[in-house]
From Swiss-Prot:
Residues 600-610 have a biased composition (Acidic residues). Belongs to the heat shock protein 70 family. GO terms for molecular function: ATP binding; ATP-dependent protein folding chaperone; unfolded protein binding. Acts as a chaperone. Residues 489-505 have a biased composition (Basic and acidic residues). PANTHER family: HEAT SHOCK PROTEIN 70KDA. Residues 489-512, 577-618 are annotated as: Disordered. SUPFAM superfamilies: Actin-like ATPase domain (SSF53067), Heat shock protein 70kD (HSP70), C-terminal subdomain (SSF100934), Heat shock protein 70kD (HSP70), peptide-binding domain (SSF100920). This is Chaperone protein DnaK. Residues 577-594 have a biased composition (Low complexity).
Amino acid sequence: MARAVGIDLGTTNSVVSVLEGGEPTVITNAEGARTTPSVVAFAKNGEVLVGEVAKRQAVTNVDRTIRSVKRHMGTDWKIDLDGKSFNPQQMSAFILQKLKRDAESYLGEKVTDAVITVPAYFNDSERQATKEAGEIAGLNVLRIVNEPTAAALAYGLDKDDQTILVFDLGGGTFDVSLLEIGDGVVEVKATNGDNHLGGDDWDQRVVDYLVKQFANGHGVDLSKDKMALQRLREAAEKAKIELSSSTETTINLPYITASAEGPLHLDEKLTRSQFQQLTADLLDRCKTPFHNVIKDAGIQLSEIDHVVLVGGSTRMPAVAELVKELTGGQEANKGVNPDEVVAIGASLQAGVLKGEVKDVLLLDVTPLSLGIETKGGIMTKLIERNTTIPTKRSEIFTTAEDNQPSVQIQVYQGEREIAAYNKKLGMFELTGLPPAPRGVPQIEVAFDIDANGIMHVAAKDLGTGKEQKMTVTGGSSLPKDEVNRMREEAEKYAEEDHARREAAESRNQGEQLVYQTEKFLKDNEDKVPADVKTEVETAVGELKEKLKGEDSAEIRTATEKVRGRLPRIWARRCTANAQAEGAAPGADAPGDAQAKADDDVVDAEIVDDEKDTKGGAA
């Protein structure tokens, strides 16, 4: 049975985990790291770079590097590159493809099934967009799971009955959830959050501060310089991380820009106190969702048994202090890695769905109320927020006008009394109603939410039996054929990247063989007969000519031709050695060295030459 993985698709970093012998293991990526930056870049040669390699070249390729795409999920955001238009689902699919490849490399088998996590406060369209991203990446998405729920699953599977508060502050989103755990049941009691609050916002405050300081000191506005701004973003992130363990840091960026007088350098000190002042209002925004969760769950602070911090941003001392203050002095649990716990929980849920993990029941909730617009623009709720899913609710509605031939069902998600102030998820029409006075027809509207938090709506005229259904997937939803087209496109990119890697390997092997053969001939000049030497040198010359071009097939053919000549010079050299009494053992033949080199070849992510020559931030 193919194994399923758990994926934490984060705003700034992503993680993939798998169950091995019933225990979750975080998979190390091709670069040797346990987290992969959620960054996608298009190199000058059209190659798609993902992760650390994409992040490293961002300074010299600002316009073609995309980060924090998770903040655009469920929207109509698009970016045009090389004559093609890309949406958030496609960008996320590139990241998921990279995680899928890393998992396949680690496991030595194909990976198709996955559980993907989303912020608890993601609405219907954001969840659907995440599911579509997985499908485009070639994954069968078994379940969309809320991040705090996954974290609680990872933390509390073996714990006794207890109440857990999960405080999840990531790179771009913030959630607070209250869960009850006991007897293998993980039940979410309440959840709240802010989908546009995270570590990126703390970074941006430092960037704004540095731009202001530099303008005051040099009269130059760095916000107008894209490359300088990218260097500032990277420096701001590093400064934020350093200030979690130090009380002061220095941000030093030489040659950040130039003026008429010459190059200008940025050199600023930033203390933890200054940093906390710059970001005090962001910290305050964490308070309201916390209080809402406690209120919705109807519990006292003293009833919370454990506090679990999730997301890299919770490493900031001010955040940890805030959580301690909000929970009445309770210390957060230090037994989980905030970067990895969500992916671990996702892999456990994947194990539950595949039958590898027994006796575990995950009861999640819908984060926002769902309803329809009724007369006067009022939001009539059918499903209240924090309702356990999957669930189904229905209500009877009627017409507002005499002889009304149809009714329009407009579906909304949110907490406001006026429908227009909430998030509109979709609409459809039930037509063919027989003429009748207003208030007479009986129309049953049913909401059905599946375990992924994705909703299906049906409207039925009880008089005629006519019915209309739809899956509410929000404005971002893609038609099935569009998802299939994007999946084929993503596979095409993967094939192109594979071809590029193969071409690079062929070139590397050819160049290595030229070097080793020429060295071997030089070192054994007196032991190789002139006719054999001439034959080999001719083949090497042909290979060198082919290496000047770009035809990989010709390079491979020329390489094999040289390899085919090697046994002859090796045999002649061995004969010469045997005839020379007391001769010391010689060096490896180039064929042997090449074979050894081939054993050591690993897949490398190729980056464009321009990046290498220009270099990154100093």
